[in-house]
Amino acid sequence: MNVIDHVRDMAAAGLHSNVRLLSSLLLTMSNNNPELFSPPQKYQLLVYHADSLFHDKEYRNAVSKYTMALQQKKALSKTSKVRPSTGNSASTPQSQCLPSEIEVKYKMAECYTMLKQDKDAIAILDGIPSRQRTPKINMMLANLYKKAGQERPSVTSYKEVLRQCPLALDAILGLLSLSVKGAEVASMTMNVIQTVPNLDWLSVWIKAYAFVHTGDNSRAISTICSLEKKSLLRDNVDLLGSLADLYFRAGDNKNSVLKFEQAQMLDPYLIKGMDVYGYLLAREGRLEDVENLGCRLFNISDQHAEPWVVSGCHSFYSKRYSRALYLGAKAIQLNSNSVQALLLKGAALRNMGRVQEAIIHFREAIRLAPCRLDCYEGLIECYLASNSIREAMVMANNVYKTLGANAQTLTLLATVCLEDPVTQEKAKTLLDKALTQRPDYIKAVVKKAELLSREQKYEDGIALLRNALANQSDCVLHRILGDFLVAVNEYQEAMDQYSIALSLDPNDQKSLEGMQKMEKEESPTDATQEEDVDDMEGSGEEGDLEGSDSEAAQWADQEQWFGMQ
């Protein structure tokens, strides 16, 4: 047993730090005396040393050593062709123990992906002949092609994975996301479904996620619910997470939160989807719950985007936009495909007046998730903020045609129509259609109430809001109802509605302002005193604003490493 055998055994045992130290010393010895180790032995040393560097996350250094190893292997191959084997018995086991050249190239590709050099990763894997590609190589290639927008080679690679491993479910999802028909994907798994027991659910699973990737949320929800109700798949965390995400996409935030909570109870260490859950909690004004969720996720892992997004949502809804921007950028650094991180950063940029930069982020979110309406909503809000009503109208019409005429797309189109006096009647028609489909859809109710307020039809608005609040409780709806009640001189009930709104979201400034305005009108003698107090407090508020400006500058200094500009 020679020293190379000892290095190999330590590598196999996972003693990476020991391998790194010993292989470094042995490589130096080899450089000083080239005759000390044979070419195959030096190749092995370089590979084992590179593997130890990879384990220590020194990816650039590892790539350098892997490259040297491949050069050594190339020279070794040329030598073996020129000089045939002499029959030396010692060389036979040595050649059998040589690390696979294909595995070395795969490790190099992994390094390149960690360094965000996807083109180099594709180039190194493309150099491997198709017949020699293992399933993991095809899977990595498929994901890299998909990320680069090269759909055809991505589909080919995913299909090759399924040919070798017909139960590779992530490869199935990859194909469905690239618009491959569910029936075609299912046909690739038919043999294994028929031969392996207890896999009768797989065809339904494929059907469900085919609906997901075509944006048919209602059929996707019903199909996954039918799966989840089966005794063998009941309480599956992945299915519950998918259901929660689908309810969110469909605008049913209440059921989305319930499913996320159910999944979280089953798996306290769940990270996937928690960014959306945190966003929903923040929207409801449950900032303390958001803060607790963020802390818990950071304790699980700070190397995922989700905890950073959750903390960013807490900052955003606390009106600390510069910090939300920083946290969103950090999340993008960790996962450039995080749609929620892109939306967070885009929203922060928009609220800071950097609309053109925000537009870039929302467009990237749309590219990654073309079936998610909230991505389009963010982009349209940017267009409206910059008075680009024509662009907003074109985008809203495209969404309406692409995702179909449902309550959400009708409301989005109506929102843009409300911005133009010429299209007010069209907005009214669209909102009526949306509310016919879903009378409880909050965004449609809010926009219809806004239209009724413009027309001063307060009684109609009150009836609309009471009907919407019959089966749900929402801060914004209670606040708007309070505003309408003030308009018809129902002050006591208006005060009650503002109080309910503030109990749901203590940070809702508009409800607080409505309540304070009523109190001033009821007590005119105290008004001047309150104004004096406000003036005295004003200096303190100015100090806070200055502090937030300095904080903005502090976070802005760090934009040099932000995920996307």
From Swiss-Prot:
GO MF annotations, alphabetized: enzyme-substrate adaptor activity; protein phosphatase binding
Compositionally biased region (Acidic residues): 528-549
Residue span of region Disordered: 513-565
Pfam families, A to Z: TPR_16, TPR_8
Modification sites for N6-acetyllysine: 229
Swiss-Prot/TrEMBL keywords: Acetylation, Cell cycle, Cell division, Cytoplasm, Cytoskeleton, Intellectual disability, Mitosis, Nucleus, Repeat, TPR repeat, Ubl conjugation pathway
Bias kind Basic and acidic residues: ranges: 513-523
Localization of this protein: Cytoplasm, Cytoskeleton; Nucleus; Cytoplasm, Cytoskeleton, Spindle
Cellular component annotations (GO), alphabetically ordered: anaphase-promoting complex; cytosol; heterochromatin; intercellular bridge; intracellular membrane-bounded organelle; microtubule cytoskeleton; mitotic spindle; nucleoplasm
Stretches forming TPR repeats: 101-134, 169-202, 203-236, 237-270, 339-372, 373-406, 407-441, 442-474, 475-508, 509-531
GO BP terms, alphabetized: anaphase-promoting complex-dependent catabolic process; brain development; cell division; positive regulation of mitotic metaphase/anaphase transition; protein branched polyubiquitination; protein K11-linked ubiquitination; protein K48-linked ubiquitination; protein ubiquitination
UniProt key word Nucleus: yes
Pathway this chain belongs to: Protein modification; protein ubiquitination
Chief localisation class: cytoplasm
InterPro entries to which the protein is assigned, alphabetical: TPR-like_helical_dom_sf, TPR_rpt
Subunit description: V-shaped homodimer. The mammalian APC/C is composed at least of 14 distinct subunits ANAPC1, ANAPC2, CDC27/APC3, ANAPC4, ANAPC5, CDC16/APC6, ANAPC7, CDC23/APC8, ANAPC10, ANAPC11, CDC26/APC12, ANAPC13, ANAPC15 and ANAPC16 that assemble into a complex of at least 19 chains with a combined molecular mass of around 1.2 MDa; APC/C interacts with FZR1 and FBXO5.
Pathological association: Ferguson-Bonni neurodevelopmental syndrome: An autosomal recessive disorder characterized by global developmental delay, impaired intellectual development, and hypotonia with early motor delay. Additional features may include dysmorphic facies, mild skeletal abnormalities, and hearing loss.
Record family assignment: Belongs to the APC7 family.
UniProt function note: Component of the anaphase promoting complex/cyclosome (APC/C), a cell cycle-regulated E3 ubiquitin ligase that controls progression through mitosis and the G1 phase of the cell cycle. The APC/C complex acts by mediating ubiquitination and subsequent degradation of target proteins: it mainly mediates the formation of 'Lys-11'-linked polyubiquitin chains and, to a lower extent, the formation of 'Lys-48'- and 'Lys-63'-linked polyubiquitin chains. The APC/C complex catalyzes assembly of branched 'Lys-11'-/'Lys-48'-linked branched ubiquitin chains on target proteins.
Protein name: Anaphase-promoting complex subunit 7
Protein's organism: Homo sapiens
Taxonomy of the source species: Eukaryota, Metazoa, Chordata, Craniata, Vertebrata
